Curated annotation (Swiss-Prot):
One example of a Gene Ontology biological process annotation: carbohydrate metabolic process
EC number per UniProt: 3.2.1.54
Species this chain originates from: Thermotoga maritima (strain ATCC 43589 / DSM 3109 / JCM 10099 / NBRC 100826 / MSB8)
Gene: aglB
Keyword Hydrolase: yes
Site (Transition state stabilizer): 298
Substrates-to-products reaction catalysed: cyclomaltodextrin + H2O = linear maltodextrin
Protein's recorded name: Cyclomaltodextrinase
């Protein structure tokens, strides 16, 4: 890695929020705020009405009214769930609900409450020892950005900041409203770094780079240099939809490779992903800083991809036990469903009677385990078995180790050899969910597995009278 990862990242569980769809603050409704949207060409919709795809992508102009005030009001919920880092999709001035088409990076959108709401949210989170990560969209801007409007008029100061041709311009995925910036131009580089530094000075804890693959390794590096120049404890994660190795100029990336492997495994499309997980662990220098996510604002929701709750729990177990930072997309913890964008961006459900309470409690337990267990926070990854998948998270002390088994198949007995000479003979391995005990015999343990089940096992010191098994290791 180019830079050491901030120390707090090892203990992090990230919660991703799409601000327009989370909660409306100050007791208001979207109707109360309608002028903020209508005067900028938006359309308002009642909370709870499912989002739908419209011709010409007109669904990006539909607003439900969520804001930063509302997010701040839900800090008790974040504590109840156990997360300690918020990642917000873009909050800067823009005329769409997703705000990936920035008009002004230095202005928090009034639709979200403006700068006052942003600073209030930041203060509330820091008072509860929570972190805030913002989304930096620097590969492109919106077509209403002042620079682009001037460039379209052939202003010589701005023309070279974009890629303009005779009858068109280069834009992200050829979406005309998202003109790409020429990030190699010095004025563009200085502008991006000013934005990065501005919000670091205001107190945010890090950045997520949108379209990190489009920006390329060099731009990712010089943004991280600016971040680490400000503070070694500020974090930079990049959106890279590839195999995770080779991007160690940042602290981590959004690990879509992990997501796709896990979903294929629990859905029965393959019976073996251990080789791939082990190779990625071995080859990815910043694996502990990567975000292990199962869904996001860019994918169908987990409950839609994996409708069976037992199989879904297996995916969540892997998310919280593989090296890296678990990322929970808002509402996934209560069972929200939704297909491709915009269906995956539905409003948060706040009526607990409509929640999948069993799933919510399961998430709470997994989050608590991930944040308190040394093996899961920083242990090495040692593959024990490929089908069903079993691995060891090996910590400095053997009693801190964690063994994970995930079986999406039929009932069976798994015989595991544990490659740690300090796991002593007769050591009890305790299932942290069921409380069952299984004893190690000569470095081997036999584990009965139900169909579509998992085990998370912790070694326990054996005491017999005054005798202690782990007195010298």
């Amino acid at each position: 890695m180019m830079y050491p990862m901030p120390s707090w990242v090892y203990d992090s569980v990230v919660y991703q929020i799409f601000p327009d769809r989370f909660f409306i603050g100050k007791g208001k409704t979207v109707e109360d705020k309608k002028d903020l949207y209508l005067k900028r060409g938006g359309v308002i919709e009642k909370w709870g009405v499912p989002p739908r795809k419209l011709p010409g992508a007109q669904h990006v102009k539909i607003f439900y009214g969520g804001d930063l005030w509302g997010i701040a009001e839900k800090v008790d919920y974040f504590e109840e769930l156990g997360i300690n880092v918020l990642y917000l999709t873009p909050i800067f001035l823009s005329d769409t609900n997703h705000k990936y088409d920035t008009i002004d990076y230095f202005r928090v959108d009034p639709q979200f409450g403006g700068k006052r709401a942003f600073l209030h949210l930041l203060r509330v989170l820091h008072e509860r020892s929570m972190k805030l990560i913002l989304d930096g969209v620097f590969n492109h801007v919106g077509s209403q950005h002042p620079w682009f409007k001037k460039a379209k008029k052939n202003d010589p100061e701005y023309v070279n900041r974009f890629f303009l041709y005779k009858d068109r311009h280069r834009s992200w995925f050829d979406v005309g409203s998202l003109p790409e910036l020429n990030v190699e131009v010095e004025e563009v580089k200085e502008y991006i770094l000013k934005v990065v530094e501005h919000y670091l000075k205001l107190g945010i804890d890090g950045w997520r780079l949108d379209c990190g693959h489009d920006l390329g390794p060099t731009v990712n590096l010089w943004i991280n240099m600016k971040v680490k120049e400000f503070s070694a404890e500020k974090y930079l994660v990049s959106e890279i939809w590839t195999y995770p190795a080779g991007w160690d100029m940042v602290d981590g990336l959004m690990n879509y490779n992990f997501r796709n492997l896990v979903l294929s495994y629990v859905n029965g499309e393959t019976d073996s992903i251990g080789f791939h997980l082990e190779r990625a662990y071995r080859e990815t220098k910043n694996i502990f800083g990567c975000w292990n996510m199962l869904d996001s604002h860019d994918t169908p929701r987990l409950a839609t991809m994996v409708p069976d709750r037992d199989l879904r729990k297996l995916a969540v177990v892997l998310q919280f036990t593989y090296p890296g930072v678990p990322l929970v997309y808002y509402g996934t913890e209560i069972g929200l469903t939704g297909g491709e964008d915009p269906e995956c961006r539905a409003t948060m459900e706040w009526n607990r009677e409509k929640w999948d309470v069993d799933l919510f409690e399961f998430y709470k337990k997994m989050i608590r385990l991930r944040r308190t267990d040394p093996g899961l926070r920083f242990g090495e990854f040692v593959l024990l078995n490929d089908s069903p998948l079993a691995f060891l998270r090996k910590a400095p002390h053997p009693l801190q180790n964690t063994i994970v088994v995930v079986n999406p198949g039929e009932e069976k007995v798994l015989v595991l050899s544990i490659p740690d000479g300090k796991i002593m003979n007769t050591t009890p391995l305790v299932d942290v969910f069921s409380g069952e005990r299984f004893h190690v015999d000569g470095g081997v343990v036999k584990l009965p597995l139900l169909a579509r089940s998992f085990r998370i096992l912790k070694p326990e010191d054996l005491r017999v009278g005054k005798y202690r098994l782990y007195k010298r290791v």
